Amino acid sequence: MKEEKTMLKIITLGDSNVGKTSLFYHYVNGEYRYNRPPSIGPDYFIKELKVENKHVFLMVWDTCGQERFQAFSPPYFRGANCYTLCFDIHNEESFINLGKWMDEIIKYCYGNIPFVLVGTKSDIPRTDKSISKARIEQWCKNIEDQGIIDKVHYFETSAKLSQNVTELYNVAAKLALEHYSIVKYISIIRPIGPPEEVKVGTCC
């Protein structure tokens, strides 16, 4: 019997210029792209891989500059199985704005929301103005204490040096598959009612 292949949707969020598209490009093409023009409009790629001995199609969405215009809508979030939430470890504003991005996720989603926290540009040496690891750990703890997610997975990455790029997407894919399996199970055992009455831990 031919193995069924599952489509998993991962959405990348974060402020402009934190390096989301560089990570996106590196994961797809295996290289860092210098002098890349500014991204405009959403884009996505589909990559086939094996997760937990299961063949899946990973659909990863990149906002590509849309965040500058707050041009998001429920359809963009619909069906997401995991998020990668990005900030620049040298940019205070991008770190503070993680709260805004979490609000967007919670606004459109229900239940325990799987996501991976991603600190970018780790190839640049930290300074006194960089976000300390202690602050990042505290942010993760606060999210866990609020019950938004059981455990925050955090990676410091560099698309330029190929640091943790594949690793973060491997974890995101695993979390997405776990979420997909839970939602699929609930949809089987629970009658499907009106959209506003069904809260199964996915975006609607």
Curated annotation (Swiss-Prot):
Alphabetic keyword roster: Cell membrane, GTP-binding, Lipoprotein, Membrane, Nucleotide-binding, Prenylation
Short sequence motif named Effector region, residue ranges: 36-44
A Pfam family assignment: Ras
Membrane topology, record value: Lipid-anchor
GO annotation, biological process: hypotonic response; phagosome-lysosome fusion
Lipidation (S-geranylgeranyl cysteine): 203-204
Listed GO CC annotations: late endosome; lysosome; phagocytic vesicle; plasma membrane
GO MF annotation list: GTP binding; GTPase activity
UniProt entry tagged with the keyword Methyltransferase: no
TM segment ranges: none
Chief location of this protein within or outside the cell: membrane
InterPro entries listed in its UniProt record: P-loop_NTPase (IPR027417), Small_GTP-bd (IPR005225), Small_GTPase (IPR001806)
Binding site for GTP: 14-21, 62-66, 120-123
Location of the protein in the cell: Cell membrane
PANTHER family hit by this protein: RAB FAMILY (PTHR47981), RAS-RELATED PROTEIN RAB-7A (PTHR47981:SF20)
Similarity remark: Belongs to the small GTPase superfamily. Rab family.
Protein name: Ras-related protein RabL
Native source organism of the sequence: Dictyostelium discoideum
